[in-house]
Amino acid sequence: MVYVPAGSQVKLNRLNGDARITIAAAQGKPGGSPALIRADEAALNRVGKDNWTRTVYTHIANNIDAARLIAGETVNQPGGWSSCPPHKHDRFAPPTEVPMEEIYYFQVELRQGFGFMRVYTAPGDSDGFDHAYAVENGDTVLIPRGYHPVVACPGYALNYTWVLAGEGRTYGAWSDDPNHAWIKQA
């Protein structure tokens, strides 16, 4: 993953084979330095248990001065869930939750595979919504707010690059859906 601060320019060269470039941006102040964070330099965490075990690679967090961004990748096992228990980061209640928009870019192996994502708000939310999306290889979902769990179809590994943007820039400052938080203790 490459971080390019506001006001900077970089040139990317493909050495060989295919290349896929995903660009995510947020308003930020100029400053800091461009950084290349290699896969083996990302913070690796195995999260969850049972059928909601996944591997999370955090490339951009407190390791570099990245203005308003936090970014990484989540690898779901075939048939596995992630962002579980469902969580959100859309209200200002530091240090436990800070508002951050998020975007997911999905990759599925094998390419004909798919998964599902639900994005929803808490009951009683005055501007509430509840949306379910079939996600396939190359799809992008913007998450301006709400809880947002993901599941991979059996037989297909589902990975997604995620980028968070917000003033708080605190990884882990989210709230679990209280209706589903019990799975952490089960």
Annotate the PLM regions.
Residues 1-52:
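Hydrophobic alpha-helical segments and helix pairs
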Residues 27, 41-137, 152-186:
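Active-site region of the double-stranded beta-helix
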Residues 1-15, 26, 134-155:
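Conserved metal-binding segment of the jelly-roll/cupin
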